[in-house]
Every structure is written in C-alpha cells, then in structure tokens.
Regions:
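Sec-dependent signal peptide recognition
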Residues: 2-8
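Residue-level signal for mature regions of secreted extracellular proteins and peptides
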Residues: 11-12
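Acidic, metal/ion-coordinating pockets
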Residues: 20-324
Length: 324
C-alpha cells in the first residue's frame, strides 16, 4: 500500500512540475512588460544651444524603448542653402550627443531637413545612419520615405511614419528617383502608406508636421485629418511645427497630441519655451496610456528643465495663461 501511495505522489509531483514548466514557457512567450515610448518636439543644433547641458536629459529617457524627436535641421557640411528665411544645420557630433541621451528615432518630415538642398538632405540620412539613429518621414526615394519603420519591441510591432504637411516646398518632396520627405498634402499617398503600415503593425504611430505657428489650438482641417488617419489605423498621432504645446487627448484607445512644441530649440517667449515629454505606455494587450512630463526650455542653455508651467497650457485656457 505504501509503495502505491508513493508512486501516486511521484506521479502527481511529476504532473505538477510539467504544468509548472508549461506555464513558465507560456509566460515567456507572452509579453508582460509595457512598451514605453517617449516623444518630444522640435530639436535643432544651432550655435545658441549649450550642448554640454543636453546630458542632463538622459535620466528622462532611460525607460524608453523608443525615444522619438523631430530633427528640425539638416546634418551636413554643405554650404549651398535653399532660398528661405531660416536655414538650419548642425554637425554630425550633434547626433552623437542626442544618441548619448537616449534618442533613437528621428522624424525628418519637416520644413528644415531640406534647408541645404538634396545633398544636405542625403548627408543627413547618412549621418543619422552613422549615429545609429533610425529615421522616418523621408528617404532616398518616395518608396522608402512612405514605407515608415516597424520596430519589434517586447513582443509588439510598432509602426512609425512621419508626414510633412508643412514641408520644404516642391523640391523637398521625395520622388521615384529623388531623395526627400513625405508630402502630407498628397492625401492619397499618405492614406495608402498608413493602410500599408497598419497591415504589418500592432500599433501605428503617425508623426505629422503641421499646424499654425504660435497657435495653441488645432485647426478644423487638422482635426478632420486626424480623424481620417485614425479611421485608417493610426493609434497614436503626435504633431510638431507650431512651436507651442497643444492639447493631448486619449479617447477609445486613440491618442493624439496635436503639437509637442519646441524641445531643444531657442526662443525668448515663454509660450515657445513651454514643452514636455510625452511618455506613452502600451500594455501587452495594446492598451494605451500616457503622461505629459512638463518642462520649460532654459533661456540660457536652450535646453529644457523640469517645470510645472507646461501643465497649464491647453487650448481652453491659453488666453489666461499665455505670457507675452
């Protein structure tokens, strides 16, 4: 009798061990950690910026799987400028500084990446590659510019696409055999790109360069564009260009931040120095949550520091909070 009981106990223990092993293997296959994505606004490397101060930002990006920024400049030694009011460029070492902080994804879908023509733009692509910073919103031709990037992070596929509604003009737009950015005014191509990215991604992030400079409120056509893009599969939309922080909304697991304003950029006005880091968390079951960590750009270093000012800047209360 005792031997039978012993055999039964061994069998039960064996089954328990097997079940435990299967459970462990199953848990390993299922992602348990949230994906963390930090997104900021405009970054350029003009001489007024104290680069040594940028290192202080590192701790705010340590948790990020993807740390995304709008590279509002060409990275080039090219001297031939496009004819426009402002032309921005920086050296390749600036990218190394950004990389050391944790930035690993740049959108180049804007009106300054082509400031030094096609050669300056191509230099920018090469320098980003050398720095180990991925990019979206542009490429050596239109196929690459519109295909976006898909990042495999903690068991989820995160698709990212940059869309230049405000761009550097007709010459800056990518073509079949020409380098350049996407063109947000080409609705059909943009919508096809979103649809294609949706098919290969668990989460789609869209980064439009749009909006009216200096405004705290999105315009009607930006709101309607966002709704259309969401209907095509965009889960997260984070804009830039206005040089101001605009409102953030999360409804029915769709997140939109109309503009993240400036980040590493110079301006004397408080409303243009008010900024933040949009810290997005995506759960294993694809639930989206966010926190806006408020900063203000220091007037001396042109690099942001923690501040509660940003939390009060919304479309609804801009009249009473704007400092002029």
């Amino acid at each position: 009798m005792r031997s039978r009981i012993a055999l039964l106990l061994c069998a039960l223990l064996s089954l328990t061990a097997c079940a435990s092993t299967e459970s462990t293997e199953s848990a390993q296959k299922t992602p348990k950690e949230d994906v963390v994505i930090n997104i900021v606004g405009d970054v350029h490397g003009e001489s007024a910026i104290r680069r040594e101060a940028i290192s202080s930002l590192r701790l705010y990006f340590e948790d990020g799987d993807l740390n995304i920024f709008n590279l509002e400049t060409a990275i080039t030694d090219e001297v031939k400028k496009e004819e426009k009011e402002y032309n921005f460029k920086a050296d390749s070492q600036f990218l190394q500084t950004l990389k050391s902080v944790g930035f690993n994804v740049a959108t180049i879908a804007n009106n300054h990446s082509y400031d030094f023509g096609e050669q300056g733009f191509l230099d920018t692509l090469q320098n980003l590659d050398k720095a180990g910073i991925s990019y979206v919103g542009g490429g050596v031709n239109s196929d690459i510019a519109y295909q976006g990037q898909v990042y495999s992070v903690k068991g989820l596929k995160i698709g990212v696409l940059g869309v230049a509604k405000v761009n550097g003009g007709p010459l800056s737009i990518a073509g079949k055999d020409k380098a350049g950015t996407t063109n947000g005014y080409d609705a059909a191509t943009t919508e096809r790109a979103i649809t294609a990215l949706r098919k290969v991604s668990d989460i789609v992030i869209l980064l439009p360069h749009w909006g009216e400079e200096g405004s705290f409120c999105p315009r009607d056509w930006e709101i309607s564009s966002a709704k259309k893009w969401q209907s095509l599969g965009a889960d997260i939309i984070v804009g830039s260009h206005t040089h101001t922080l605009q409102e953030v909304q999360l409804k029915e697991n769709k997140l939109i931040a109309y503009s993240m304003g400036n980040f590493i950029f110079y301006s004397s006005q408080l409303e243009n120095r008010t900024t933040g880091i949009l810290k997005i968390r995506i759960s294993p079951n694809k639930r989206i949550s966010y926190e806006l960590q408020p900063f203000v750009i220091d007037n001396l270093t042109k690099v942001p520091v923690i501040s509660e000012v940003a939390s009060s800047y919304t479309c609804e209360n801009q009249a009473k909070t704007t400092v002029r």
